């Protein structure tokens, strides 16, 4: 099926299809270290390549935007190369993208988020878009909540920290963008700190990753990652997000913004 990716189009092509488009999809990522395992493009390229595959499934039902390549990554600033954006700036960027496209006649918008640090800004942006402008915007993740059972027996649930440059994330990169994954992958060098205590898994504390979380910037064991797992993971999440879009674009869909993490 023909995909509609803004980066690959000229304006007359957008003009010709815009009345058919039911949902604009906006990938969000980061420029953030992922240890010795995957490049700074990890979050962005995962989200963007995922959305392109979604476009191949859904054709002229969706328009895939260029990715937002920066995010909130303050907790990774101990590692050279990481770039972080202030939350209030991110909110404005997300809103301005939607407001621009809404002016061209597009009605509904879904951010597909590849970086956990963006969650708060995305939630604030979609709420403000609806409350102030009456625009229906949503966001969803593309990570472990969808595929947790798939990695049973591969991810050690008893390890103190995991979930960054790990078995799951690295597998997805190996499938979606193999150029962004290194062959000589390393296990995370977890630090003995307050951050590695279980009580903070669903909470928070001040973090300097180099001293409090991981000496090499990875959490989990990327040595177990495979492209095959990444493909299986991606196809499952594609099913979930495609179904989400179909639900959100039904004629009788209720008004109001909704966030799915």
Regions found by a protein language model. Give the residues of each.
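Extended, histidine- and acidic-residue-enriched regions that form the cofactor-binding/catalytic faces
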Residues: 1-110, 116-261
């Amino acid at each position: 099926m023909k995909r509609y990716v803004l980066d690959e189009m000229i304006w007359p092509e957008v003009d010709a299809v815009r009345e058919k488009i039911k949902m604009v999809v906006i990938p969000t990522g980061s420029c953030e270290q992922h240890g010795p395992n995957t490049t700074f493009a990890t979050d962005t390229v995962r989200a963007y390549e995922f959305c392109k595959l979604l476009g191949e499934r859904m054709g002229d039902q969706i328009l895939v935007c260029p990715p937002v390549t920066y995010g909130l990554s303050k907790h990774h600033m101990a590692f050279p190369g990481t770039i972080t954006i202030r939350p209030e700036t991110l909110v404005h960027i997300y809103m301005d993208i939607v407001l621009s496209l809404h002016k061209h006649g597009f009605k509904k918008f879904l951010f597909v988020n590849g970086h956990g640090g963006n969650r708060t800004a995305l939630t604030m942006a979609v709420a403000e878009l609806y409350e102030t402008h009456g625009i229906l915007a949503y966001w969803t993740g593309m990570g472990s909540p969808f595929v947790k059972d798939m990695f049973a027996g591969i991810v050690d649930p008893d390890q103190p920290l995991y979930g960054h440059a790990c078995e799951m994330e690295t597998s997805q990169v190996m499938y979606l963008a193999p150029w962004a994954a290194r062959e000589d992958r390393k296990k995370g060098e977890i630090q003995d700190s307050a951050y590695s205590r279980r009580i903070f898994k669903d909470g928070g504390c001040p973090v300097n990753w180099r001293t409090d979380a991981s000496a090499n910037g990875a959490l989990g064991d990327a040595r177990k990652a495979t492209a095959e797992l990444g493909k299986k993971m991606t196809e499952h999440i594609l099913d979930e997000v495609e179904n989400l879009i179909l639900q959100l674009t039904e004629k009788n869909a209720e008004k109001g913004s909704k966030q799915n993490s």
